[in-house]
UniProtKB/Swiss-Prot annotation:
Gene: deoB
Assigned EC number: 5.4.2.7
Function of the protein: Isomerase that catalyzes the conversion of deoxy-ribose 1-phosphate (dRib-1-P) and ribose 1-phosphate (Rib-1-P) to deoxy-ribose 5-phosphate (dRib-5-P) and ribose 5-phosphate (Rib-5-P), respectively.
GO BP terms in the entry: 2-deoxyribose 1-phosphate catabolic process; 5-phosphoribose 1-diphosphate biosynthetic process; metabolic compound salvage; nucleotide metabolic process
Domain of life: Bacteria
Entry note: cofactor: Binds 2 manganese ions.
Record family assignment: Belongs to the phosphopentomutase family.
Protein name as catalogued: Phosphopentomutase
Localization per record: Cytoplasm
Amino acid sequence: MKPTCKRVFLIVMDSVGIGEAPDAEKYNDKGADTLGHIAEHRGGLNMPNMAKLGLSNIREIEGIPKAEKPLAYYTKMQEASAGKDTMTGHWELMGLRIDTPFQVFPDGFPKELIDELEKQTGRKVIGNKPASGTAIIDELGPEHMETGALIVYTSADSVLQIAAHEEVIPLEELYRICKIARELTLDEKYMVGRVIARPFIGTPGNFQRTANRHDYALKPFGRTVMNELQDAGYDVIAIGKIADIYDNEGVTKTLRTKSNMDGMDKLVNTLQMNFTGLSFLNLVDFDALYGHRRDPKGYGDALEEFDARLPEVFERLKEDDLLIITADHGNDPVHHGTDHTREYVPLLVYSPSMNGGKQLPLRETFADVGATIAENFGVKMPKYGTSFLQELK
């Protein structure tokens, strides 16, 4: 069967939520509104290209006019899974439903986990708090070099990171320690998405992380639409942190990125490639640099920079291409705390072959995106999700 669209370009604007989800209160997120609050904070957002697609038609956002004739089909999606982290949102987009949320540790890891890690590795743990990776090695690197203690830290995502100097703890030993941590955190009460080895070199005041980082992720808990595409011989091009999020499952080519703008450069490159399948981009800066840091000005600037790159995408899209723009959760930079927020996410679906867009019904799960991609390529449909392919005219 010939696919309806030869290439699908899926962009996940990491953490760009569009207002509190119906169950936001359960997550301590009542009133969260990533896009709305950023726009309000700066007296409006200037995003003319997203405006043309129909962003403000989903719901009005200050500074972004409603399109009289939106180019895209538009709606918002509600997350069905339990959780509001990157892995849960992305796995659901590709047809899975996660009922046990990944754990985050804003106050560091529980004492019993740290005690067990110390016991099994024979090394003391220092740190045990959320931190920037470069800041914590500057702070604790000298003590680590003296004592051989493990620098353990986390972030706002579901990760346990272990930093060690390559001359103090050789790489193979660090990797062995991370495998122990991975085993310990498979326990449901800890359920950590990723364990990361973070080796570094240098001297106090001049430490540098090396390229010998290693991730011990969880494989998705079931087959995703990406697995089905790969097995059917289609291309699945993962741009940014997509390959890490799915532990390389269902990925045929990986393009790493340094920033949102680098991600857009790589996307433009894939638009010029001849392939049949999915190009899947995650733009992480919104979340990592601005959402968690509660920086609404920086977040707004990044949204406007992203919008300014969209004409390069539009002019390279072919008649039989499909562009899908969405998000994986919220991260309201005006909200309390530093964590993600439980929100609806926007959904904009565009192809040059469309004769204008209109409103789609509210989606009750992110998995509708995966189901639509699966139907387009004629591969096995995911267990969750309802395709909207036939609603696109």
